[in-house]
Design a protein with these regions (language model features):
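Low-complexity intrinsically disordered segments
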Residues: 2-4, 56-85
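Short N-terminal "domain-start" leader segments
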Residues: 1-31, 36-38
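A short, exposed loop/beta-hairpin motif centered on an aromatic-Gly-Thr core
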Residues: 41-57
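Residue-level marker of intrinsically disordered, low-complexity segments enriched
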Residues: 14, 39, 47, 78-79, ...
């Protein structure tokens, strides 16, 4: 099994001030994406993530891997169908 970073879109439901009204807003971010042995997506992180590293080199590695996600198709987290592991 493998993983990579992917750009993802999801719709957020946002409350309008103190009223009972809501509005929806599309947003984009980076998620970790996990693949089964057939190369199908079986999981993603629930929240968007940001670059992180315990060392400067780890941070650079993470950032560069995240940049690669812009070359892949954007995932639609509202409609994704996850495969089995």
């Amino acid at each position: 099994m493998s993983w990579n970073y992917r750009i993802a879109r999801k719709t957020l439901k946002c409350k309008v001030d103190l009223s009972d009204d809501y509005y929806e807003e599309d947003c984009f971010g980076i998620v970790e994406c996990y693949y089964n042995e057939e190369g199908e997506i079986y999981a993603t992180t629930e929240s968007f993530i940001e670059p992180y590293g315990e060392t400067l080199e780890e941070l650079k590695w993470s950032f560069n891997k995240m940049k690669e996600a812009f070359e892949k198709e954007v995932l639609d987290l509202d409609n994704i169908v996850y495969a089995k592991i």
